[in-house]
């Protein structure tokens, strides 16, 4: 479900793209340092965005280092790390841990049980350190599972589960920015969930998997409706973002929120246009 909150590279300045990658590599390294190889496997673009957002908002002191890694062994990579990077790494691991726990409880996936056991020790310590976030992640994923079991077509209910999850992750500190960050995260989370459901719908139909958009997709105006809903969700999120006094890396943040989040949607539309052309040629 993650991977939608990333940069639009063609619209980003070279220096900003380098800095974005340094944040991404910094999060990757922190995951490895704090949680080992399995923690590193939970790396997401979405939590990289959270690192940049919260680092900008709280003007956190960030250290710059250069390291080699297995992915890029030939050349040292720029890496940016701070205390928020550690927080984001912890949230990555919590999300992965609870997701694997749900997979085991619901579907008895042996692979999930085995992977979960590899990070369980450190995940338990993280749960103790972040009880507020841990409880919301657990409850939100549980309710999402209930939506799936009930085959609920209530789009707002399903998307709201993931919205509340993201809202909690954005609240690093319970302070004056908490309310704005919650709302921003809530609507961004709903956007992520709905974009994922929109992208997965054709495959979910083929494999008879749960997708809350199946009923809406029967309407002739489905495509227009989905675009409108997605635009509403991201608009509500960006309105809250613009209320935050973010100055550092604001061009990167705006690139992600106004352009990057649409990367997958634009690819889907391009593929649909190409498919339509192929169909017309075959007639």
Predicted regions and their residues:
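Acidic catalytic motifs of isoprenoid enzymes
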Residues: 1-183, 190, 194-231, 239-252, ...
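Conserved functional acidic sites
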Residues: 278
């Amino acid at each position: 479900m993650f991977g939608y909150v990333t940069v639009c590279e063609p619209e980003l300045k070279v220096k900003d793209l380098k800095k974005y990658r340094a944040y991404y590599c910094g999060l990757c390294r922190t995951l490895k340092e704090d949680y080992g190889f399995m923690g590193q496997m939970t790396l997401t673009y979405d939590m990289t965005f959270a690192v940049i957002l919260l680092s900008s908002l709280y003007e956190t002191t960030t250290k710059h280092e250069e390291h080699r890694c297995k992915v890029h062994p030939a050349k040292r990579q720029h890496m940016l790390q701070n205390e928020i990077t550690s927080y984001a790494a912890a949230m990555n691991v919590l999300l992965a841990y609870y997701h694997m726990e749900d997979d085991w409880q619901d579907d008895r996936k042996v692979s999930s049980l085995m992977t979960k056991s590899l990070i369980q020790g450190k995940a338990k310590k993280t749960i103790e350190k972040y009880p507020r976030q841990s409880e919301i992640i657990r409850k939100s994923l549980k309710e999402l599972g209930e939506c799936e079991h009930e085959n609920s077509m209530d789009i707002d209910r399903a998307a709201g589960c993931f919205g509340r999850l993201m809202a909690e992750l954005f609240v690093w500190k319970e302070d004056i920015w908490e309310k704005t960050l919650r709302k921003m995260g809530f609507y961004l989370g709903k956007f992520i969930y709905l974009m994922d459901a929109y992208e997965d719908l054709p495959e979910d139909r083929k494999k008879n998997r749960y997708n809350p958009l199946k009923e809406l997709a029967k309407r002739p105006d489905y495509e227009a409706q989905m675009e409108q809903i997605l635009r509403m969700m991201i608009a509500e999120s960006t309105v809250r973002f613009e209320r935050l006094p973010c100055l550092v890396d604001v061009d990167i943040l705006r690139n992600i929120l106004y352009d990057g989040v649409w990367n997958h949607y634009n690819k889907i539309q391009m593929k649909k246009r190409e498919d339509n052309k192929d169909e017309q040629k075959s007639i």
